Amino acid sequence: MKPDYKLVAKAKYIHAAADLASELWHEVYKRYYPAKQLDTLVDALQSADVIEEDIDNDVNYFLVFLGDKLIGYFAWKMENTALHLLHLYLRPEYRGKALGRDILASCERLARGEGRGRVSCEVYAKCLPVMQFFKARGYRVLAPAETVVEGIPMQLTTLEKML
C-alpha cells in the first residue's frame, strides 16, 4: 500500500500535525534532552501556532497516511535555489520500510520540476541513523549549524544534495 500525503491547511490538520510532532519529537529526542527541555523545544518549534505561522510563511506541511492511519509528517519550503526539507518524521513501526526514502524522492522530483538545483536539510548531529539515511541517498555534510532555541542549544548539521 502506498502512503497518501495530505496538505496541512485546515485547523484540524494543523492540530493533528502538532500533536503528531509532539509525539514523534518526544520519541526521537528523549535520549538527547531532558523532558522539560524537550517540551520547551516542541512548543517553540512544532506547536499548532508555530505550524500555522510556518504555513503563513510558505512552508508546506504534509501528513502521511497509510490507509486511514496517520504515520508521519514532513514539511518543506522552496527557497531561491533549493527545496529546504524542514521536517521528516515517521512513527517508529514505519521506519525502515522505504517510506522516508519515497518522501525524500518526491521532494527531490518536486525541486527538479520547480527548477531548483538542490535539496537541503538540517539534521540533529547526534541522530546517527538519520545522518546515515541522508548520506545513503547522496546527501553530503556541509557544516555544523548550531542554534539556540529558548536557551537550549541544538547541535545540527546541514546536509545537501545537488540535483
Model-derived features: positions:
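Basic/polar N-terminal segments that are highly enriched at the extreme N-terminus
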Residues: 1-2
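Acetyl-CoA-dependent GNAT
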Residues: 5-93, 104-106, 110, 114, ...
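Short, surface-exposed alpha-helical segments at coil->helix boundaries
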Residues: 48, 128-131
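Short amphipathic helical patch at the helix-1/turn junction of helix-turn-helix
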Residues: 90, 124-125
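Conserved G/P- and acidic residue-centered "switch" motifs that form tight phosphate/ATP-binding loops
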Residues: 98
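Residues forming the Rossmann-fold NAD(P)(H) cofactor-binding site
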Residues: 101
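Conserved GNAT acetyl-CoA-binding A-motif
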Residues: 111-123
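Conserved catalytic-core motifs of GNAT/GCN5-like acyltransferases
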Residues: 120-124, 131, 135, 140-156
